[in-house]
């Protein structure tokens, strides 16, 4: 992989670090230097996991329709008009690889610091474990976007992504196979497991033993390792109880605290510049006369999504709910969960659209177990029903394909806006068909070709293009993805 420039963005504090992040004399091989590098890596992880950086995976699917208010933000994704030379695609690719490069740099310096400061070895090893985790996580995110869904029977032939393990900004690495990519992910997870000793706690802002377990559950499901996916996911239930009230779900998104949260990266008034705002889901202005909001959204949920949220569901309101929308005659439905943390608002009624990235929460673990059980032996109703009843719905007795449909629908209800849908579609092999929200048709953009778009499960453009910059500057890379070779 070829980087656009030198690694930047480390949190230097008071250390003497040059602009290209070279060690400056007395600060070499010290815990305080590695600690500063660690801060920078956490900052980068906060940025790449921010919901503002996940919107394009949502716009690409059948969850949202673009409106005339979008200003074309995300429009190329919504219209499936991606090309290898798109700057947004290059930015996504570069953000992940920049973080990986920072990790590799920090790992080298941490190893050197252990030699020079053996009295700090325990803390430095913990930092190294966190860095291995971050590298595995970044590679996995790249694979989810730029590779096919993992198929154990074909992984040795499926195209992967470069997996740099040394600090070499100019390295020209081949993309390799998807089997090799996941081998690197699992190897880094093992390295993290051996070094991270921080025990899990609700709303942890750091990488913990439990965060690693949650990540293992995600990867195991992706690799069709269903027994381990079930074991990893279910091991987290007791420490992170499901929320079973509407107020509890509101607290998750408005207050940033929840018993379900396994890992949530911290954002404060001083650091919210690390993340972007998810304004286009709402763009609301407070109407003092009525005490309500008038919304001008760039993207609205599709009708089939709105229909999944019934009044008895505690997520109706906090996740998707009724809204007064500018220039439509009847009440519409909007995705409400990312209106922003109250504690980051400048005034009580001014929506800011800044939310702390919730990297792992236990609701996903129930859905992982349900899907893994279904894939393994056709079961899965028990964990699915546990989640449904916690959300105010009735449990399910569905079986067969009807059960799998219920699992899929629950994934939409629970994780709308959080960047899961594209990867779910690929893993399930179901294709997509858009279905415009009836109340909002008059403000939709792109015509029926966009808001009634249909894609078959085998459409190669479910995989995003490799940036042209990478292909042009890395002769060892290999092939462009199938959907973008002409």
Where are these regions (language model features)?
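Inward-facing hydrophobic residues that define packing positions of alpha-helical scaffold repeats
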Residues: 100-103, 182, 189, 233, ...
